[in-house]
Amino acid sequence: MSELTIFKNIKIDDVERMLKCFEARKLVYKKDRTILSNLVNTKVIGIVLDGTANMVRYDYNGNRTIIEKLERDSIFGEVFSYLGNDISVVATSDCEVLFFDYTYLINRCKKSCMCHSMLTDNVLQLLSKKIIELNERLEVLSKRTTRDKLLGYFDLLVKGRVDRFFYLPFSYTELADYLSVDRSAMMREIKNLKEDGIITVNGKKIVLNY
């Protein structure tokens, strides 16, 4: 548990004590089960301990947009209520989630222990990181064509890396929902990118040739 970013630099004994103080609970969800139905007024913070989930939004026609993929160490819940009340979190594999009440984060316990301050700092770091990632996603979505959206997203996946390949974190259907594009049009554009020699595709492995 102490290897999670939210508990960074906090001793394992202090982590266990805080979880008990916070009345934290672990819940297990099967694939495709809804973990949270909306992020507003949930009053909880969730941390993915194992498995994966998607943060999703559905419009009035039932069209899905994937906001973010959540993996081990990802945080969600009340801290992301600014995204709106129509955001849900859905398990994409069997997963285990740790929950605790948001009020324990913002209200100091009577002891005002140092580990509580460190926890708050860690959450703020996670929030800052997520805001940067969401802004990068908005930049990708602002591109006019499906081709530019794909290449913009691919560039994000290799950002800061020496090699120029990656494994898609989504299925192709999920990727289309993440980029807010038609799946058939997206697959045609991926085919065009392959034929133009810009990318090489082997299953979910994609190599950027530029």
Please report, for each region that a protein language model flagged, where it lies by residue.
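Phosphate-/nucleic-acid-contacting segments
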Residues: 155-210
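A short beta-loop-beta micro-motif enriched in histidine and acidic residues
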Residues: 21-22, 32-45, 63-64, 82-85
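Cyclic nucleotide-binding regulatory module and flanking cytosolic helices
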Residues: 1-31, 75-76, 80-82
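Long, hydrophobic or amphipathic alpha-helical segments
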Residues: 117-120, 124-134, 138
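Cyclic-nucleotide recognition modules
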Residues: 66-124
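N-terminal positioning helix adjacent to the helix-turn-helix/winged-helix DNA-binding module
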Residues: 119, 142, 146-149, 171
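Short acidic-glycine-tyrosine-enriched beta hairpin
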Residues: 11, 30-33, 59-76
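Glycine- and acidic-residue-biased ligand/ion/polar-headgroup-sensing regions
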Residues: 43-56, 72-73
